[in-house]
Regions:
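Catalytic cores of eukaryotic secretory-pathway lumenal/extracellular enzymes that build
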Residues: 71-277
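N-terminal targeting or regulatory segments adjacent to alpha/beta-hydrolase or S9 domains
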Residues: 2-89
Length: 279
């Protein structure tokens, strides 16, 4: 758990220089994660000088992060976590960048040895990154080596959403899931794929749905591990439900009332939060 948190926290890298070409004139460049020593030293100094707020006695996670947990996390991050080891591990993956609509887009591209493998575009969510898919790259691209059937193999394309990991952040407002989906469809075309599958969860599910909707001529199928179906406006969501189902709705309502503060600030004033997190 702690290791996964830190993999998404160091976002400075230097791309390799030479690259391959896709199906159009825009270059596709190999990418290597290479965080400068000075960045790591600065991080260690910030962690060493971390200041912790006073906490209410016994509040735990009621009002946000438990300060005891935070202190343990910082201690692990500063004294135990080995970024260079993770860097070496991640650099074993086939990483690339390419410019689409003015943004450098980072992605993993693993081709299967099977000649008829179906290309599969998988998009992560928040707070995530391409790292969450590293354990499935082998089984999906080479199922025979993991007890599966060779004909079930996929070519994998795992992009980093703009603003995540090593993809450039958007430089203008309004870069919504529809625009991100268009970027991903262009990426698949640039890689030469005319027919491909789409998978996603969390924001990846929302983006993936838009890819399937707006690039339907090329999308063979869509798989989601987050499916939402809110009732139409003006419809009583509890109508016709059993008592146990109504109880679950109350759990949802309580979660929305007490546990979605992050949605409010990120959805309205992300810049303010960004200043604090960046420092």
């Amino acid at each position: 758990m702690l290791r996964q948190l830190f993999l998404a926290s160091l976002l400075v890298a230097v791309p390799a220089v030479c690259g391959a070409q896709g199906s159009d004139s825009a270059p596709i460049r190999p990418f290597t994660i290479r965080v400068p020593d000075a960045v790591l030293a600065d991080l260690k100094a910030r962690l060493a000088n971390a200041r912790y707020p006073d906490a209410l006695q016994g509040d735990g996670w009621t009002y946000g992060t438990d300060v005891r947990y935070l202190k343990a996390l910082v201690d692990y991050w500063r004294n135990t976590f080995d970024w260079r080891a993770q860097e070496r591990r991640l650099n074993q993956l086939e990483q690339f960048t390419t410019q689409i609509d003015g943004l450098n887009v980072h992605f993993i591209h693993r081709r299967s040895k099977q000649p008829n493998a179906l290309p599969l575009l998988i998009t992560h969510g928040w707070p995530g990154s391409f790292v969450e898919f590293t354990k499935i790259i082998g089984p999906l691209t080479d199922p025979a080596a993991h007890g599966g059937r060779p004909e079930d193999a996929f070519d994998l394309v795992l992009p980093s959403i703009p603003g995540f990991a090593f993809s450039d952040k958007p430089r203008e407002a309004g870069y919504d899931p529809v625009r991100i989906a268009a970027t991903e469809a262009k990426l698949m075309a640039r890689l030469g794929y005319q027919r491909y599958g789409v998978q996603g969860g969390d924001w990846g599910a929302i983006i993936g749905t838009q890819v399937a909707r707006n690039d339907a001529a090329h999308v063979a199928g869509l798989h989601l591990n987050m499916c939402t179906a809110p009732p139409p406006a003006g419809v009583d969501s509890s109508a016709g439900l059993s008592e146990s189902e109504r109880a679950r709705l109350k759990v949802r309502d309580r979660f929305q009332a007490e546990e979605t503060g992050y949605q409010q600030i990120q959805g309205t004033k992300p810049q303010t939060l960004g200043f604090a997190l960046n420092d």
